């Protein structure tokens, strides 16, 4: 499919750090900030796909040293972070053939300046794990550094959340993206840039808000990450779980609202348990999937 101009500048791959020496545990980051408040200028929560999908509040379990695009002379003025990167990252980067990464060893290999510019005015952004069986987007606070294993959407729109959480988006992604084992390997250029998005409607805004609020409450109350929660949603043996039934109902409403926004009133979605890509999922039926991508 053709890449669409209206979708450009929205979906980005996160930052490619390249060097475990940049990464700190939460306690050490807080100790460094307590030792010198200026360190807060270069220390940030660091979120990867595993944390996003496994932690009930989708929060980062680690922090990262991020000098941004600062020159070396300025990076030196943050002694603790600089010393860590000097001793742990520089020796590894010295072995690299790519000159920029070797010579600018105190910087991320890919800092994602376009992503940062696109999200600079937002208090939160939508993210999706790049490799995932769940393939569900969630909002996170802006200011968290996303790893290159996250896809970031420069938007705080609840209607876009609904669109990305819909079966239409999932079926499109499965058709046009790669796979890693049975998991979806999401490529923004192949999936989001080519996806003809529906008209934004009030119904999509409203059901996107419902999904965001109710799913978050269920995850926190039951101490479940996205992967474990959606494993329950896709488990045909689970028939009498009110939270799971509610989440399935929300996704039916999301799909109905999305199809309506596209103007596809004649598609019978046939929600239920269907075999898809060698696994059983709670999703739309085979005939609906064919109509969606045709």
Tell me what each language-model feature is.
Residues 1-294:
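S-adenosyl-L-methionine
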